[in-house]
């Protein structure tokens, strides 16, 4: 399963993969969510897994202990012709701050399902 926050893009992983592809989608507002779903479909992904329980990424003890640093870019947001603050709500690395998207509702789920026939 490939995360929205992967360092590699959907397309890069699809090109290298030998097995079934699932995409873990973090809701990023309608425009970015739709773009990600379309790209997943076009790249040959077979399922969308929506994650809604991560409103704010937490500092994980193991990451702090191992001095993990966030990457400078996330593959799925590379080469977008949008200002960083339109992608993440801040001037931080695009895609890291999932808390900036509007909370997802049942209507949003219905809308998301209408975008694709993928399970």
Q: In which residue ranges do the predicted regions lie?
A:
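Active-site entrance/lid segments in N-terminal catalytic domains of soluble metabolic enzymes
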Residues: 1-119
